[in-house]
Amino acid sequence: MKWIIQEEKEEDHLQILNKDSEIGIDEVGRGSVFGPVFSVAVVLSKKSGLTLKKLGVNDSKKLTPKKRKDFFPKIIALSSDYALGQSSVREIDLLGIRHATELSMIRAVKKLKHMPSELLIDGPLTLRLWEGNQRNIISGDSKFISIATASIIAKVMRDSLMERLESKYPGYFIFKNKGYGTKQHFSSLKKHGLTNLHRKSFLNKLNLI
């Protein structure tokens, strides 16, 4: 296994951009206290990447929820391939969030039609179970369009799940907090107790259970 963790140098950035396509991967929900962690891998040709950049696609954290939803079908249409992987709350509690996040990323990559020779991963999390090359890029979602699009798809898909779960788990304001530990969410936990989708390992550390 080969990996590089780095602040991407300009010459490396240009080298990747000169390739015919790039495969980016990002996760969402790692810091949540409720629900699974999602990871998405996206394969983008150089041409599609340039088209999406011209449309204004950027790091999902810099976009409004409406913008992310607007970009979602465009990204799906222009990507050569994409795949979602996830790890359940049970896996997060049993394995720990680091291992569970890695597992969700591996699952996403394994669902791609063709195994990539190199992955561009947002942040420092190395995939120990991945045999190919990988580049771990700090703030990768603001530097590489494939990572940015993976971030958007993952965010839209997980947010959609959280909104659907609101009716099944009322009183926790999941549609609003998307499973993250807001003051309102913690207050609801004290009032209603835990559900089967709350991460006990996280809440234990916060002394909330």
UniProtKB/Swiss-Prot annotation:
* A Pfam family annotated for this UniProt entry: RNase_HII
Give the primary localization class: cytoplasm
What is the cofactor note? Answer: Manganese or magnesium. Binds 1 divalent metal ion per monomer in the absence of substrate. May bind a second metal ion after substrate binding.
Tell me a GO cellular component.
cytoplasm
Q: Which PROSITE patterns does this chain map to? A: RNASE_H_2
In short, the EC number is 3.1.26.4
Record key words, sorted: Cytoplasm, Endonuclease, Hydrolase, Manganese, Metal-binding, Nuclease
Which reactions does this protein catalyse? Endonucleolytic cleavage to 5'-phosphomonoester
List the cofactors: Mn(2+); Mg(2+)
The record lists a divalent metal cation as bound by: D26, E27, D122
* Location(s), subcellular: Cytoplasm
Range of residues in the leader sequence: none
Q: Name one GO biological process term.
A: DNA replication, removal of RNA primer
What is the role of the protein in this entry?
Answer: Endonuclease that specifically degrades the RNA of RNA-DNA hybrids.
Family designation: Belongs to the RNase HII family.
The name this protein carries in UniProt is Ribonuclease HII
